[in-house]
Amino acid sequence: MVDRLADLRFDGLELGGFKPHPNPDDLATGEQRAAVRERVAEAGMAFSGLAADLWSQKLINTTDTTDYIRCFRKNAQFCVDLGIRTIRVDCVQPPTILAEVDEESARRRVVQTWKRCSQEAADKGLWVTWEFEPGFAFNKPSDILRIVDEVDEDNFGVLFDACHAHMVAAVGARQPGRKETLPGGAVELARRLRGKINHIHLIDSDGTLHDNETSTHAPFGEGELNFDELLPELNKAGVPHDWWTIDLCFWPDAWAVTERCKKAVDELNRKYGG
């Protein structure tokens, strides 16, 4: 995979920290982790971030998030050892969980936990980025704005995935109760989140869900997004680094469209890159 991405002239890759990929449990020693870091560097690349495997943990429907924090801490050290500056989190549990736990308690629990995680990550020089999406709780625009404000840590921000932003802000997919969308869709959400976005995933959206769970990550040109409107706004977001990550999550035979997506992002970079 590393060699193939290097052949396509990628600058790096984003690591899913779960089997069969490199993860903190399988790479338990400093030597093993150093070898992975060196392998990527030898190919002329680096890691843009880590999607930490926190999905086996409970975050919303528990009064004790100690295990979640412990798992986060393990992944944060993994980031340090691999030279990764950004660690991704999400709400772990689906929006239907809010039928079991009252929303106020759930949000408070998420905010307090992520605040603690962000403080520990800051001590390690890491950014914490929250990927909101239809498939997880707190998937309304007002939820996103409120939670990032309440966590209120300099190294905590939002992962703005273009397809999730469209499904949340334009479609209102899987939102419990009254649907909440924005007239300007993803672009308006990006505008409202200026100064609060610290990571970006670029991919198209066809307005559908994958398996009725989370956003379909459609290759560029197969969706509804207007990147000529979105990218100028994202350039105003104040993201603290220059990574743009192509996200083909759940796309069948992703390798078949990776080169095409890379060319699409290269063109966006020529037009809007700093």
Give, region by region, the residue ranges found by the protein language model.
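Short acidic/histidine-rich active-site segments
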Residues: 202-204, 243-251
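Active-site acidic/histidine proton-transfer and metal-coordination neighborhood
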Residues: 41-42, 58-160
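Acidic/histidine-rich catalytic cores of soluble enzymes
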Residues: 13, 50, 115-219, 224
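Short beta-strand segments at enzyme active-site cores
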Residues: 14-15, 47-52, 85-92, 126-131, ...
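N-terminal pre-domain/capping segments
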Residues: 1-86, 115, 153-157, 232, ...
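H/E-rich (His + Asp/Glu) clusters that bind or coordinate divalent metals
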Residues: 223, 230, 235-237, 242-246
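Acidic-and-aromatic substrate-binding clefts and catalytic sites of carbohydrate-active enzymes
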Residues: 18-32, 56-66, 94-99, 134-140, ...
